[in-house]
Design a protein with these regions (language model features):
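A short beta-sheet element
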Residues: 1, 121-182
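Well-ordered mid-protein domain cores that form the structural environment of catalytic cofactors
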Residues: 1-12, 16, 168-195
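Eukaryotic intrinsically disordered and solvent-exposed regulatory patches
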Residues: 13-14, 96-97, 125-126, 152, ...
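A short glycine-rich beta-alpha junction/loop motif
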Residues: 15-34, 158-164, 195-213
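Conserved hydrophobic/aromatic beta-strand scaffold that supports enzyme active sites
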Residues: 27, 110, 137-139, 166, ...
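A structural detector for beta-sheet-dominated domains
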Residues: 31, 84, 141, 170, ...
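Non-catalytic DNA-recognition/assembly elements of restriction-modification systems
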Residues: 33-97, 101-118, 213-247
Length: 247
């Protein structure tokens, strides 16, 4: 019904606003049974067919993507990198804490010492623009019980506490970022409240990554690898949904 109802918007504007009385008088052209009643069965079957066609097209796309990505996989060499060399720009969070900022459900992500919700504690006002930091980076959690040593990839801009340090590299995207955070998290077992993840210790951490023939991080391999995993998971889900249609 939604596409048909939305067509009513063509009749209205700021000079002729919709109201309760006008909406009551509106008429919708819908499929009807032989008895003149709304044919809900037809509408449901029609939309299921549309959904099924879209699903089949999507399945084909992801099958092809998985096939292409698999061709790019294969043997790979690995090399150790100092975190400070991998991320030439390492900056700490700028916020002084939630007591100094107003919470807002429609605001910006506020990051803190947690590995839950991709590091997001809540959403806050954007008023203090000096504390807003750019996304497309990796957030390294340096404090917090149960969270110290973890890292998360952040795509969006954010405000964060000083318990986190953010690494920037021009090759980062959500695929290379999640590849690196998965490996970077292996270090979490070495830290505790007696041996904290200071900024200095963080910069000296070692991350082992796949490399190309020049010995540089193989960003293309990392991206292809994560795309392959993503496609495989989506493909599994879509097949499950497709099986539901069979019933």
């Amino acid at each position: 019904m939604i596409p048909i109802i939305n067509r009513l918007s063509e009749k209205y504007s700021f000079n002729r606003e919709i109201n309760d009385e006008r909406i009551k008088r509106e008429k919708l052209l819908l499929p009807a049974t032989d008895k003149g009643e709304i044919d809900f069965a037809f509408m449901s079957a029609f939309m299921k067919d549309v959904e099924h066609n879209i699903l089949n097209t999507t399945l084909k796309v992801f099958k092809e993507r998985v096939s292409v990505n698999k061709l790019k996989m294969g043997g790979v060499n690995w090399k150790n990198f100092l975190l400070r060399d991998l991320f030439p720009t390492l900056v700490a969070g700028k916020s002084k804490g939630l007591n100094h900022i107003e919470k807002s459900d429609s605001g910006i992500s506020y990051l803190g010492a947690t590995n839950q919700n991709n590091g997001v504690l809540c959403f806050v006002s954007r008023e203090d623009k000096s504390t807003i930091q750019k996304g497309n980076c990796i957030a390294f959690i340096r404090n917090g019980e149960g969270s110290m040593g973890y890292s998360v990839y952040k795509a969006e801009d954010f405000i964060a506490t000083s318990d986190m340090t953010f690494g920037y590299n021009n090759h980062l995207n959500r695929y290379t970022g999640t590849f690196i955070t998965t490996i970077a998290d292996w270090v979490r077992g070495k830290y505790n409240f007696g041996y904290k993840r200071s900024a200095n210790r963080l910069s000296k951490e070692i991350i082992t990554l796949p490399v190309d023939n020049d010995g540089s991080p193989d960003w293309e391999y990392m991206e292809d690898y994560m795309r392959n995993i993503e496609s495989a998971h989506i493909l599994t889900y879509l097949k499950m949904v497709q099986n539901d249609f069979a019933y």
